[in-house]
């Protein structure tokens, strides 16, 4: 009825023929003189980020970004950050509400890391990490804060090669927090990999690859603090 009454335009021309085909990605559609905005479908992606990619849409130094790995038509943004030298689980989406939900500290979404450090970690070191450590807010400030209690366990120690591997679970996600926590107990980080965000695990996702989240996975993430 709207078409027959001449109320619909495509690319500036009135459409009067029923069944007219359009390309929603290219054609401009108007109804009663007002442009009809396309409602973009929300997409949710889990990426196993490699080392060497920055977590940003565009980098001022032309370094590779995570969007170079996920080439889709939707305009997606990273959910949180992983520094250039950290690999592992990173979500991307075009749903702003979802980003706020996952990244806001009040929601306390857990992130689990596998950390390889120089030296042999003791049980005393583990307790210090569990109880929270005072670390700098950033490299440019003298301001510090005490990290929230973390879940920590030793996965491996190798006295011959002089390294330890830990699993650390936090929910704050401050800038380079896990690295700074390890530095606070005198341990240099040799490798850092984010294994999980909440219950999303990248163990079966090849490094550099990505997949869409299922509806159930998105639902579980949105219900985390309910």
Residue ranges, per PLM feature:
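Basic, flexible Lys/Arg- and Gly-enriched helix-loop patches that mediate nucleic-acid binding at interfaces
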Residues: 1-226
